[in-house]
């Protein structure tokens, strides 16, 4: 009997800890009620499903539109992997769409063999959707994207994709700015030349993927001298 009571006490204690932790985690995620977080599903024009978390700060209204940033996680990562980025950006007043890239998390698999180049793993469709003024609280002239690793490649490809579109239409790029983290392989001249987006790059000096970069050895990740970063600055 005593053993059973002790087990019940332990169970209740664990239950209280779980509920309390979940409550405080929710407060942090919503910046103590200042940000509304919703799970969304976008049915894209090509019949796919893009699942994302929409972080909407209370200051974002129809009369006070705010910038939108689409956040793209890296390879084999669901949206929760970059929730810290979404939380911090939304705390600062940005509307954030944190996506599950195609074939990851709850989003559908891609119908394209070039999902980064032609779709940005779903980011392109969401930028188009936002630019069409489907979010009344978003300033469509200030739409940006950021991603890490594979998500960084999506951001680079987005700058190229929407840049080409802007050149054809003679209008401003739908993707105003991109910030690339941990990926420089596609910072090539043939991709950068059509970009019409503001661009920032972050890369670790000893990134584990630096062996694939243009430079070799210890300088492979040195963005002070790397051809990839110099091409970006001079593009």
What are these regions (language model features)?
Residues 61-65, 74-107, 209-211:
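Short substrate-entry loop that stabilizes the transition state in hydrolases
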Residues 25-64:
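N-terminal cap/lid segment of alpha/beta-hydrolase-fold proteins
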Residues 170-234:
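The feature captures the conserved acid-bearing segment of alpha/beta-hydrolase catalytic domains
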Residues 1-17:
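N-terminal Sec-pathway targeting helices
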Residues 81, 113-137, 157:
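Alpha/beta-hydrolase active-site loop
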Residues 147-151, 155:
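Gly/Ala-rich beta-loop-alpha elbow adjacent to hydrolase catalytic centers
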Residues 158-175:
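Conserved hydrolase catalytic core segment
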